[in-house]
């Protein structure tokens, strides 16, 4: 007998920026950018919907964002606050199912297949969750409801912000057929271009290719796309998902104090970290810089983006932002390190369009 799964994907709307607008009424309705200082080689962690109208997006250099919208308000992230709010949201989700899989601070899958809440209706549960998040946390969330993780995630992005989309087995084929290939989960600029070159622009175009043909063009990720195009995704909601990190550090032969020299070394470290991410089929949201001084004391500085990254160029944009806020106190440095955490399995190994630095 076929399992009747009911999966909800909850995605908070412009999470960090929305928290700042909630806590600071003067920011409401204004283009707000959470991230680094545009005068210090910063990077955008996230931005409000008012800022997005100007073409600003996560992982964009702050200087570029400033040029697009000079009147934008730039503020530093308050990660401890965001983590606290995230726990509030996750606590609400856990009241509806013991199968909750957080993907990051601002999104999670919820398997309500066996839930008796709201008469067992996944749609009503999703609406109730959205209402509770708004009343209890003061933020909006978008929800996708479907019979597997791929479709639930695609659905949550369909009517942002503060929307809900339900994809049933009956309407799933039509939804997938019309879905632009660049919107498919994990399809980035490079994969999109490869598929466009063979005449694939929407989900329906994928149906004209066999699994073998897609694997020949895209490797293992061709199999994933073949299945996604047919509404197939058998991945389970995993509440025990282990958060791991990937990092590299170098102890220097001689202590240094020149920032440009540090940047050169960090660039090499970022390259090794990026290679490891690719080899392990991973992407991450949090970039952490570690600096150990010649008195053996060390500090770390982190930034968490809204979207996942793996490329060296993207990592270095964050690292340059982080090193700009380190107070060296005239001390020399003996060790440098970079760690990427909040990892997601990179099902299709390509950078996503919104993470491109080609601005």
UniProtKB/Swiss-Prot annotation:
PROSITE patterns per the UniProt record, alphabetical? UMUC
Question: What sequence ranges are listed for the domain UmuC?
Answer: 7-188
Q: Which SUPFAM superfamilies does this entry report, sorted A to Z? A: DNA/RNA polymerases, Lesion bypass DNA polymerase (Y-family), little finger domain
- Residues the record marks as site: Substrate discrimination: 16
The residues that cross the membrane are none
Give the cofactors, semicolon-separated.
Answer: Mg(2+)
List the EC numbers from the record.
Answer: 2.7.7.7
MF-aspect GO terms: damaged DNA binding; DNA-directed DNA polymerase activity; magnesium ion binding
Principal localisation: cytoplasm
Q: What class of enzyme is it?
A: transferase
Keyword annotations for this protein, in alphabetical order, are: Cytoplasm, DNA damage, DNA repair, DNA replication, DNA-binding, DNA-directed DNA polymerase, Magnesium, Metal-binding, Mutator protein, Nucleotidyltransferase, Transferase
Report residues binding Mg(2+): 11, 106
Q: Does the keyword Cytoplasm apply?
A: yes
Say yes or no: keyword Aminoacyl-tRNA synthetase present. no
Active-site residues (renumbered): 107
The UniProt entry's GO biological process terms, in alphabetical order, are: DNA-templated DNA replication; error-prone translesion synthesis; SOS response
The cofactor remark states: Binds 2 magnesium ions per subunit.
Task: Give the family from UniProt.
Answer: Belongs to the DNA polymerase type-Y family.
Q: What does this protein do?
A: Poorly processive, error-prone DNA polymerase involved in untargeted mutagenesis. Copies undamaged DNA at stalled replication forks, which arise in vivo from mismatched or misaligned primer ends. These misaligned primers can be extended by PolIV. Exhibits no 3'-5' exonuclease (proofreading) activity. May be involved in translesional synthesis, in conjunction with the beta clamp from PolIII.
How is the subunit organization of this protein annotated in UniProt? Monomer.
Q: What PANTHER family does this protein map onto?
A: DNA POLYMERASE KAPPA (PTHR11076:SF33), DNA REPAIR POLYMERASE UMUC / TRANSFERASE FAMILY MEMBER (PTHR11076)
Name this protein carries in UniProt? DNA polymerase IV
Q: What's the source species for this entry?
A: Clostridium perfringens (strain SM101 / Type A)
Q: Which gene encodes it?
A: dinB
